[in-house]
Curated annotation (Swiss-Prot):
Catalytic residue positions: T13
Enzyme class: hydrolase
EC number of this enzyme: 3.4.25.2
One GO term (biological process): proteolysis involved in protein catabolic process
Protein name according to UniProt: ATP-dependent protease subunit HslV
Signal peptide residue numbers: none
Keyword Metal-binding: yes
Modes of activity regulation: Allosterically activated by HslU binding.
Quaternary structure, from the entry: A double ring-shaped homohexamer of HslV is capped on each side by a ring-shaped HslU homohexamer. The assembly of the HslU/HslV complex is dependent on binding of ATP.
Record's keyword terms, sorted: Allosteric enzyme, Cytoplasm, Hydrolase, Metal-binding, Protease, Sodium, Threonine protease
Gene Ontology cellular component list: HslUV protease complex; proteasome core complex
GO molecular function annotations of the record: metal ion binding; threonine-type endopeptidase activity
Role description: Protease subunit of a proteasome-like degradation complex believed to be a general protein degrading machinery.
């Protein structure tokens, strides 16, 4: 437990993005845990931004993530149809701004052409194998998705199955899956 939060650490979620077969799918589970307690099982941590042209998912402190999503929306308005540029500008602000520097969250964002992970360390990472995952069950979901990429399964089927596997292993991930899909280039 921290001195500021008597309930312990907030653990929340698994988010995965899969790009395959002309589709990009982002999926997230719905669990929010506070310490050893499941506070909510149907949270929506994957959503559309920028008039539906961008999908975003977050892991970490919810209020921090919403702050970052709002800032990303502003960057997308400044740099329309330039997700990479908007993400880099957000990461620069996140790293250098005294207030933003303390935000505890990670984000995955995707549009028709690119998928990115954005961190508070100033990282903007593009996956090389068509999939990337974050959050408490991110490594499990990522490994499962990588194993399924060579099968005949669709991007949606891979994302859903990867989250199911993560939910079977990670106590901070449940099986309430929310999916968003875009046509990819």
């Amino acid at each position: 437990m921290s001195e500021h939060n008597p309930y312990g650490t907030m653990h929340a979620t698994t988010i995965i993005t899969v790009r395959k077969g002309g589709k990009v799918v982002m999926a997230g589970d719905g669990q929010v845990s506070l310490g050893q307690t499941v506070m909510k099982g149907n949270a929506r941590k994957v959503r559309r931004l920028s008039k539906g042209d961008v999908i975003a998912g977050f892991a970490g402190a919810t209020a921090d993530a919403f702050t970052l999503l709002e800032r990303l929306e502003v960057k997308l308005e400044q740099y329309p149809d330039q997700l990479m540029r908007a993400a880099v500008e957000l990461a620069k602000d996140w790293r250098t701004n005294k207030y933003l520097r303390n935000l505890e969250a990670m984000m995955l964002v995707a549009d028709r052409s690119v998928t990115l992970a954005i961190t508070g360390n100033g990282d903007v990472l593009e996956p090389e194998h068509g999939t990337i995952a974050i959050g408490s069950g991110g490594n499990y979901a990522f490994a499962a998705a990588r194993a399924l990429m060579d099968t005949d399964r669709s991007a949606e089927e891979i994302a859903r199955r990867a989250l199911e596997i993560a939910g079977d292993i990670c106590v901070y991930t449940n099986h309430n899956v929310v999916l968003e899909t875009l046509d990819a280039e």
